Amino acid sequence: MKDQAAQVAQVSLTWPAIRTTAMAAIAALGLSGCTGIGYYWQSVSGHLQMMNAARPVSDWLDDAQTPEQLKTRLALSQRIRSFAASELNLPDNASYRRYADLQRRAVVWNVVAAPELSLTLKTWCFPVAGCVGYRGYFSEAEARAEAARLQATGLEVGVFGVPAYSTLGWLNWAGGDPLLNTFIAYPEGELARLIIHELAHQVVYAQDDTMFNESFATAVERLGGQRWLATQASPAARAEYAAFDGRRQQFQALVRATRHRLDAIYDLNWAPAPARAAQVAMKSIAISDFKQQYEQLKTAWGGFAGYDPWVAQANNAAFGAQAAYDELVPGFEALFKREGGDWRRFYDAVKRLASLPKEERHQALETRNTDK
């Protein structure tokens, strides 16, 4: 089981340390006609197939055919689920009380795209979910076909398999979001963080603001995951997580530094053609340096290669997507501290921020970060 967990954790890193809220299916429920019936159909049918495959965790635990390793993980997931509700004040509802084996490595594949000299992601807008910087597909082949189409228009693209997505609690009446084989074998600390992250999306959702939504959920998963490990996990689980998280933090720091370097280069993207050629050259050097520094990290990690798939397709789309998940996290963590570590007060404060115009809420979080 440990080898399986390591393998699954490595696969998840194709969307590195970013357990995304894909919302592919829930967004499709409000699609306008111009989006296309094909995308609508794959979104709805893919989600329904997943829901139909899910069975209550209690059924899996009572089934003599269920492998003991899976029973152990499912039992752990239910302890985490109860902890999230009782200790973190996250919603206590139908989500993550059922399990489905999808017989594939990802639940959806997200397509992201950005211009040659910008980290600003292309967005897709839906009447229900608002505008998001990715487009989700239940079929990897369809995702790659969409990426190829976008690439043909001159955009840089990325296709990332993701292990989970949230329906924001809107479908709890139909059974909620299920546990999936795509993440159930994660190391304990990572499993706790994923469940906490996805439940956080059911607390607050600001339309048209992926960065706010994902940074909030990431802050909750970090704070809540730390509490789980400190109070519930075994010393072995804490040690395993410390090694895993240490690598993640080093990788994220490298990605963040490179992203800021690219941003500085692209600040001149209004320049005439000769200057643009210089920008392209500087960009190439920055990404080459990123890959060289990553190889140095791998050596220090003893050869751990979990981030290889992400690095292999590192481009503006990949760096732009990462920004949504960590840019505002320090501000949210500072806000949690200002609210005395009280989860209910923290969530209420975040809801007030979500009611503000986008620029105002971002500025408020950035100010809190500098004042902490």
Which residue ranges define each predicted feature?
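Bacterial N-terminal signal peptides that target proteins for export
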Residues: 4-22
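C-terminal motif of bacterial Sec signal peptides marking the signal peptidase cleavage site
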Residues: 32-33
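Metalloprotease/metallohydrolase-associated module, dominated by Zn2+-dependent proteases
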Residues: 38-43, 47-58, 182-189, 214, ...
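Solvent-exposed, acidic/flexible segments
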Residues: 50, 63, 70-77, 136-143, ...
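Acidic/histidine-rich, surface-exposed loop or edge segments in extracytoplasmic proteins
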Residues: 51-68, 124-132, 312-314, 330
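Post-signal-peptide N-terminal segment of Sec-exported extracytoplasmic proteins
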Residues: 56-87
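Acidic/His-rich structured neighborhood in mature extracellular/periplasmic domains
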Residues: 80-248, 263
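Pan-zinc metallopeptidase signature
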Residues: 253-372
